Amino acid sequence: MIKSSKIVIIGGGIVGCSTAYHLANLGLEVCLIESGKLTAGSTWHAAGLVGQLRTNANITQLLGYSVDLYDKLEKETGLSTGWKMNGGLRLACNKERWQEVLRQTTTAHSFGLEMELLSPKEAQDLWPIMNIDDVFGAAFLPTDGQANPTDISQALAKGARNKGAKIIEETKALKVVVEDGVIIALETDKGTIQCERIVCCCGQWTRQFAQTVGVNVPLVSFQHQYLVTEKIDGVESNLPTLRDPDRLIYFKEEVGGLAMGGYEPNPLSWAEKSVPDNFHFSLLDSDYDHFEQIMNNALGRVPKLETAGIKELINGPESFTPDGNFILGESPELNNFYVGAGFNAYGIAAGGGAGMALAEWV
């Protein structure tokens, strides 16, 4: 166990690993500790879509950075990442949504993000098995893609190690030691690490850990489900990811079938007071009744789902924030205590850019 490190990152999901990677690339002394194994929280069960288009221009730029990073990471580290730049479709099914897409196109082009406007038929040419009866138009981002969340994280961790970062698994953070308002150490169950700065990337555990030093992180865990189908005729390996915000659903190709999930208007919270310490590589029980509303929306878009075999329905809790934006930066309550959490189920897309931004702040 090391005795000191200028910077300690708590949490070995994709955001923690990305932050370690970027800090190490800046030549800074950094140690990452993870209470279980890397990706054991919510990273391992994420669907893995990597889309760049958001209503916020700054976030869109961070997501664009993630794409650039993931595109080179496998070559840099020698580890497979599952990264596939198959493009992403975003549907608009009414005039209001179409106007939003037009505004986003202008924003995207202003900082060099490639984005094409498509007719319903052109969108269907890229995604042949979807119904377009209610589609007003679509946006296509050819540099969107998908990745294997665990593999991406392991590649980031290797890249960090290659630049001198220390990564220590199965080590639980217990207490931040503060003297006269200054962070001086982090106590763990394996010993104390003298440090100057702490970056809290604990995912769903962030709120409860940050509270121990008086830092408020407004996030809560919600159940988030997606299903994985058997092979479906017409689903090719290069099928773009698909987002349908008016139906609150998304799709990606998964070994010749589809992964499909969505966002219920009445989501179910989980572990509101405290996320269990040992919730590692764990899932919640599938809730087919609650998923029915998402499934009905998806059937309207992809009728072939009605006869598709279902491999599994994955119910993995994710952390969400009140405004739908992630929480990133130095806490106002404690100097040199940084937070990267609350990624609202798009942490894989945000991970590369969020880690870069955190590293530059730290």
Where would I find each of the regions flagged by the language model?
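Dinucleotide-binding Rossmann-like beta1-alpha1 core, especially the glycine-rich loop
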Residues: 48-126, 248-251, 255-257, 278, ...
